[in-house]
């Protein structure tokens, strides 16, 4: 098989590093209106405030959790069996789907009968694929437009709120100053949301199931949940919700095995990946994808043209609509939740890329551009777009309309080719919505900071507020090896301006296929960017975690500082490099300033002085300055004293 020949289905096992709970964290479930709506969250426990700081209780903080059952010690994890079919009952009870007697795609049947791949295949699936009954539409958008609040929508509303109201209520009972503490910890700076309706002075204080339904019906948000991926935990992508992060994984012709890609998926979701795209281009794409989907609690996206190209031995000009259609059905019946489809690469735009510094950098875009030139006609993706919609709504696969002409350098940013394609994607969005097919739009790419908002504004206008999903953008081209940072800058900005999901970039971008460590670095960097965007927009409750960590920092609760952070392991590692002893975990200083120059310790000294003198903090500062002034004059009023 791939470069690593060791993977066999019988020996498959979970990555042990991905199943241990994070420090001082436990998985909790919030039940909805019915017992089978159990929404997972991560509860981070905190130590009490030391008596010297007031001695109050610090209740647990709840955070969004994408890790699925993997971080639940009560769950039995066996990747050979896959995850439980969480949504199966919801799908079946709607009565608009049917279980097929077998696979519909020619390629799927061919692979199932191939004895050469039998030892690689996932053997744990004991159900056949489902499809909409003839004449039915099973998309979440279709239900939303009919006024139906699905269990998925209720699940999402609970998940987005992160038990914020319960946390603030628990603060009120934490001690005699509970009401004051709740007001302080719940305080949040007003955001600038650039027109996003959920935020601002008249915005929401919490997300409701009805609001979720309205946003999906409007096309401003999508719920990527294929009916053949019932293992997935419902989530939402839209500018009026928490900014999400996607992680790209996948093998290539020269590296990685099925086992490694499953490990990358479990590692990505441990650190906060909201969706995962399998971009495999090497051998056994079908089998790799099956293992990933069956073991993924988050939506899985793909670029179907990659696999279609493999079926014609890499010759783009030999691609046909029939081959591509069969590939869509094959992947839809496996359970892929969203497809990147480069239907906006039109023949008329291809010559516009000749003036670029870096030409066409999208793999999918270059494949379709080559096909258009070879046949001198519009691509079969564009010509058959409504046929594709018919497939999508039969399985509830969402469109991720690909930016095949995205700029690959800041030199090419916002050029005619890029913006022409974006306008076409807006036109295709209207066609998809006519079929009630959920749709998001992919965006750049490499864009300098001053041009980022123009990208967002044009997308909102031309694509009628369909969710934007961007790769970065990278804000400079001078830092190979650090493109998670060059792109994280742009990601935070465009997330603030309205992008709904950010596609991570790892340190290996432009250099090689990322390993597990690179995946973690990319995810953490992009969770940081997404959270910064949520804060800037004024997402209700976004600042709760910041406030909790800042309070822990001021009270020298080191363990709580580590555990409330995005990467507790890294924070603890850095601290322990210079102060490894357990006693340092309760010290009132760190190695940066030492015991005598810690600004927070000095502030505490001022407060203690104020309490002793019976004055306010401001009065204490003034009084302390007067004492020092007298002392200074007595020593001769010299700035530098001889010792």
From Swiss-Prot:
Superkingdom of origin: Bacteria
An individual GO BP term: thiamine diphosphate biosynthetic process
EC number: 4.1.99.17
List of residues binding Zn(2+): 446, 510
InterPro entries: ThiC (IPR037509), ThiC-associated_dom (IPR025747), ThiC/Bza_core_dom (IPR038521), ThiC/BzaA/B (IPR002817)
Cellular component aspect of the GO annotation: cytosol
EC primary class: lyase
GO molecular function list: 4 iron, 4 sulfur cluster binding; carbon-carbon lyase activity; zinc ion binding
Keyword Transmembrane: no
HAMAP family in the record: ThiC
PANTHER family according to UniProt: PHOSPHOMETHYLPYRIMIDINE SYNTHASE, CHLOROPLASTIC, THIAMINE BIOSYNTHESIS PROTEIN THIC
Family of this protein: Belongs to the ThiC family.
UniProt-recorded name of the protein: Phosphomethylpyrimidine synthase
């Amino acid at each position: 098989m791939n470069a690593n020949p060791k993977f066999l289905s019988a020996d498959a096992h979970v990555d042990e590093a991905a199943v241990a709970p994070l420090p001082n964290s436990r998985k909790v479930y919030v039940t909805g209106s019915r017992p089978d709506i159990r929404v997972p969250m991560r509860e981070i426990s905190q130590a009490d405030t030391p008596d010297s700081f007031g001695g109050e209780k610090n209740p647990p903080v709840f955070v969004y959790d994408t890790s699925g059952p993997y971080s639940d010690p009560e769950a039995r994890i066996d990747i050979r069996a896959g995850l439980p079919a969480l949504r199966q009952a919801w799908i079946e009870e709607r009565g608009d789907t049917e279980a097929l007697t077998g696979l519909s795609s020619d390629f799927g049947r061919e692979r199932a009968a191939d004895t050469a791949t039998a030892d690689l295949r996932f053997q744990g699936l004991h159900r056949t694929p489902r499809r909409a009954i003839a004449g039915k539409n099973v998309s979440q958008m279709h239900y939303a437009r009919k006024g139906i609040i699905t269990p998925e929508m209720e699940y999402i509303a609970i998940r987005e709120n992160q038990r914020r109201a319960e946390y603030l209520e628990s603060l009120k009972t934490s001690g005699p100053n509970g009401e004051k503490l709740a007001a302080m910890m719940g305080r949040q700076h007003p955001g600038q949301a650039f027109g996003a309706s959920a935020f601002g002075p008249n915005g929401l204080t919490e997300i409701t199931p009805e609001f979720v339904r309205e946003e999906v019906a409007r096309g401003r948000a999508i719920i990527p949940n294929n009916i053949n991926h019932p293992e997935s935990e419902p989530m939402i992508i839209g500018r009026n919700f928490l900014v999400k992060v996607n992680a790209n994984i996948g093998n290539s012709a020269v590296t990685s095995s099925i086992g490694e890609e499953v490990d990358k998926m479990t590692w990505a979701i441990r650190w906060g990946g909201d969706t995962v795209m399998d971009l495999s281009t090497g051998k056994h794409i079908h089998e790799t994808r099956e293992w990933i989907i069956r073991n993924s609690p988050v939506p899985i996206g793909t670029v179907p043209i990659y696999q279609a190209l493999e079926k014609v031995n890499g010759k783009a000009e030999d691609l046909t609509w029939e081959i591509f259609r069969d590939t869509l059905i094959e992947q839809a019946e496996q359970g892929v939740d969203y497809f990147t489809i480069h239907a906006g690469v039109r023949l008329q735009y291809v010559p516009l890329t000749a003036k670029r510094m870096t030409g066409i950098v999208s793999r999918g875009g270059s494949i379709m551009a080559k096909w258009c030139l070879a046949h001198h006609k519009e691509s079969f993706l564009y010509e058959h777009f409504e046929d594709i919609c018919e497939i999508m709504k039969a399985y509830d696969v969402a469109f991720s309309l690909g930016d095949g002409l995205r700029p690959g350098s800041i030199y090419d940013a916002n050029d005619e080719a890029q913006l022409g394609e974006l306008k076409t994607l807006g036109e295709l969005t209207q066609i998809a919505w006519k079929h009630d097919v959920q749709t998001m739009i992919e965006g750049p790419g490499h864009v300098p900071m001053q041009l980022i908002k123009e990208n967002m504004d044009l997308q909102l206008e031309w694509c009628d507020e369909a969710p934007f999903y961007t790769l970065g953008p990278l804000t400079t081209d001078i830092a190979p090896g650090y493109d998670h940072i060059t792109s994280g800058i742009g990601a935070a900005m465009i997330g603030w301006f309205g992008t709904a999901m950010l596609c991570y970039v790892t340190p290996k971008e432009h250099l090689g296929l990322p390993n597990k460590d690179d995946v973690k670095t990319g995810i953490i960097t992009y969770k940081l960017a997404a959270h910064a965007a949520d804060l800037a927009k004024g997402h209700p409750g976004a600042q709760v975690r910041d406030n909790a960590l800042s309070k822990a920092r001021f009270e020298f609760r080191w363990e709580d500082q580590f555990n409330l952070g995005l990467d507790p392991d890294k924070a603890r590692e850095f601290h322990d490099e210079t102060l490894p002893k357990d006693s340092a975990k309760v010290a009132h200083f760190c190695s940066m300033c030492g015991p005598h120059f810690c600004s927070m310790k000095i502030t505490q000294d001022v407060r203690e002085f104020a309490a002793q003198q019976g004055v306010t903090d401001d009065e204490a500062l003034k009084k302390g300055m007067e004492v020092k002034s007298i002392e200074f004059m007595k020593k001769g009023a010299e700035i530098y004293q001889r010792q």
